[in-house]
A protein has these predicted regions:
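The feature captures the beta-strand-to-loop junction immediately N-terminal to the Walker
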Residues: 39-41
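Helix-to-loop junction immediately C-terminal to a conserved catalytic motif
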Residues: 54
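ABC ATPase NBD Q-loop/coupling interface
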Residues: 63-81
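Conserved ABC ATPase "signature" region
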Residues: 106, 121-139, 164
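Conserved ABC ATPase signature
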Residues: 118, 143-147, 151
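Catalytic Walker B motif of ABC-type/P-loop ATPase nucleotide-binding domains
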Residues: 168-172
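ABC ATPase nucleotide-binding domains
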Residues: 242-271
Length: 271
């Protein structure tokens, strides 16, 4: 994967939980205006890799760079400097009690605050836009402890968008969402990339990756099986190797997008 125009890069990363390596020698780059999807079976290292790019999991070996700055060690960016440029939506976040949706979304502006100063005009506009994009404006004054899982997912995403970073990292952003909001969130992600944001997103749904990704990184057992554009990576051979099940890949007759279907013993067979 080319490092041209790369905003965030991982080089030869070895990531471990305790003594066990869960990512072994992986390199990747997130480029401006590009959606890079990380796909693969459970336990393949996707979320750990994303957390390392977000400076939440220090590599045993290798390095992460944001532009020409290192993320750890000498000359590393400060926490606020990093947070002004990179944000991460994780899969699991604690649900705060006694705070409103607006409060949680406003928290995305914390890298820009100093002392007791509140949100400035630009920050208020960013909060409004983030809530509009994720469809949570009408619930702004509701307590977040009253929300469903899907509603809460959209609120946390709005908080990330309010941060206005050049790099957006998303771990399963369509989790818990019904079909309408899955489509809307995927559209938002694509729109942000079209505006120049570098997006790295973990997805379990291969069809979602086919819809929005420019580049795909297919992982299995902590290593890269294939990387490249959708057509290069989402193939029967690569997917069957990574997932350990036969995967039929075809173009949707209506949209033309690649469609991936795993074939079990009772699955209808393609003609």
């Amino acid at each position: 994967m080319s490092t041209e125009d790369a905003l965030l890069t991982g080089h030869d990363l070895v990531l471990a939980h305790q003594e066990r390596a869960v990512v072994d020698g992986v390199s990747l780059s997130l480029r401006a205006g590009t959606v890079t999807a990380l796909v693969g079976p459970n336990g393949s290292g996707k979320s750990t890799l994303l957390r390392s790019l977000a400076r939440l999991h220090k590599p045993r070996e290798g390095r992460v760079r944001l532009g020409d700055r290192t993320v750890w060690g000498a000359n590393a960016l400060s926490g606020k400097e990093f947070a002004r440029q990179v944000t991460l939506l994780t899969q699991h976040r604690p649900t705060p009690s006694g705070v409103s949706v607006r409060d949680v979304v406003s928290y995305g502006r914390y890298p820009y605050r100093s002392g007791w100063r509140g949100v400035d005009v630009d920050g208020a506009a960013a909060i409004r836009r983030a809530m509009d994009l994720t469809g949570v404006t009408l619930m702004a004054e509701r307590g977040v402890d009253e929300l469903s899982g899907g509603e809460l997912q959209r609120v946390w995403l709005a908080s990330c968008l309010a941060q206005q970073t050049s790099v957006l990292l998303l771990d399963e952003p369509t989790n818990h969402l019904d079909l309408r909001y899955q489509v809307e969130i995927l559209d938002v992600v694509r729109d942000l990339a079209n505006e120049g944001v570098a997006v790295g997103v973990v997805l379990h749904d291969l069809d979602h990756a086919a819809i929005i990704a420019d580049e795909v990184v297919l992982l299995s057992e902590g290593t890269i099986v294939a990387t490249g554009d959708i057509g290069q990576v989402l193939t029967t051979g690569h997917l069957s190797q990574a997932y350990g099940v036969t995967v039929h890949v075809a173009n949707d007759p209506v949209t033309g997008a690649i469609h991936c279907r795993p074939l079990g013993r009772h699955s209808p067979r393609p003609a």
